[in-house]
Amino acid sequence: MAHGLVTFSDVAIDFSQEEWACLDSRQRDLYWDVMLENYSNLVSLDLESPYGTKSLPTEKGIYEINLSKWNSNGKSKSLGLDWMCEGEFEGPQGPRESCFNQMIINYEKTPTCRENTSVRPHQRLHTRENSYECKECGKAFSRGYQLTQHQKIHTGEKPYECKECKKAFRWGNQLTQHQKIHTGEKPYECKDCGKAFRWGSSLVIHKRIHTGEKPYECKDCEKAFRRGDELTQHQRFHTGEKDYECKDCGKTFSRVYKLIQHKRIHSGEKPYECKDCGKAFICGSSLVQHKRIHTGEKPYECQECGKAFTRVNYLTQHQKIHTGEKPHECKECGKAFRWGSSLVKHERIHTGEKPYKCTECGKAFNCGYHLTQHERIHTGETPYKCKECGKAFIYGSSLVKHERIHTGEKPYECKECGKAFSHGHQLTQHQKIHTGEKSFECKECGKACNHVNHLREHQRVHTAEKPFEQKEGAEASIQHSFLPQHKENP
């Protein structure tokens, strides 16, 4: 690393006075520990010091910062705090400048950091010393506070509770971040698109969308990511590592939040409830997506055709229509699919697996979506409502088809004659006129028809059924009045 490229201000952590007040003594000790380590690292690498200590000669080459107490008269740029101290830097020529509180930084300007006791935390970067081991799982850490934080995963301890909603957290900084949800505070705004964020780290990650920067690269396949946690998760595909196991069913997960969500399947807990319709969900993201049914919001738009979607994964799936990409192939029959989930569902045709069972009637389905739709028959839920006439439907696809009555849209056009239809199955039936296909055959005489309704009419010849038979009186005239309609609309 070149001399002077990194200063202490580049690695300092920002805290406002209010945020600092939220930290307990252990967290403040942790803060000073980290700041000391960062400063020692810079010194040991002979990088620029914000305190100018390198220009102060001493007999031994050792410099000491003597410290005093804090006040709130200004801001320390080097620490990023809204406080500064009244103490002074004591060099061989007397007081020099303002300094840290309750910290003494000693370092010796020598060629190697290993000869200096003040840079032991830095040495662990080279030696990878992990002297603090968890007795529960064997995981080791280089710092004691890291082990303390980790152990809360096993004990379930969550000492930091939100006064607004009573939600509890393992660490204080998680609570601080969570509280911004209640206040609605989003102080970090993107200059490129105006989008605002609760946390500065979210803004930093977001900016990479505009710059295209992907600083985290996988050494195995060279795939790059915007975020470090995305890389960590990706690397588990190569290693097969799954750290978090469900004690109820043994299923393992690569991320702890996925395990937490999964456990709610066993417990039945659905903490995220829609205020509009009362429907509850296992995870918050599902609630956010559900709310778009009520608001009509479709934030994800296809740049090719302008079609918009409520979920980003729907857009990703849709875009494969334009590219024609079908990377997922069935080993049994060779059929290819755009999406892996479609392949999984398709494979159940071969295996006969139907893992999704209705608790009301026992009917089983090969995919969860079909079960969800089926359950609405029992509950009577019709979440998809037409804005024109107010008619409601069980399925979103039914609403889409219904809306074509109002719009007059007929998106399915016959390439042979140009006739258009509002539904795909109508076009399929119509095309049989051109192809001569007659797929519906009478078992009595072998006559084939191109439409199931035509077959039903024909079968009455064999059964001698006469649904529109002439009768005397008013009843006969009423029944006979339907006969012309039947002939016009076979």
Swiss-Prot record:
This is Zinc finger protein 331. One of its GO terms (cellular component) is nucleus. GO terms for molecular function: DNA-binding transcription factor activity, RNA polymerase II-specific; RNA polymerase II transcription regulatory region sequence-specific DNA binding; zinc ion binding. Residues 6-78 form the KRAB domain. Signal peptide: none annotated. It is found in: Nucleus. InterPro entries: KRAB (IPR001909), KRAB_dom_sf (IPR036051), Znf_C2H2_sf (IPR036236), Znf_C2H2_type (IPR013087). May be involved in transcriptional regulation. May play a role in spermatogenesis. Gene3D superfamilies: 6.10.140.140, Classic Zinc Finger (3.30.160.60). It comes from Canis lupus familiaris. Pfam families: KRAB, zf-C2H2, zf-C2H2_6. The gene is ZNF331. A zinc finger (C2H2-type) spans 132-154, 160-182, 188-210, 216-238, 244-266, 272-294, 300-322, 328-350, 356-378, 384-406, 412-434, 440-462. Belongs to the krueppel C2H2-type zinc-finger protein family. Keywords: DNA-binding, Isopeptide bond, Metal-binding, Nucleus, Repeat, Transcription, Transcription regulation, Ubl conjugation, Zinc, Zinc-finger. GO terms for biological process: regulation of transcription by RNA polymerase II.
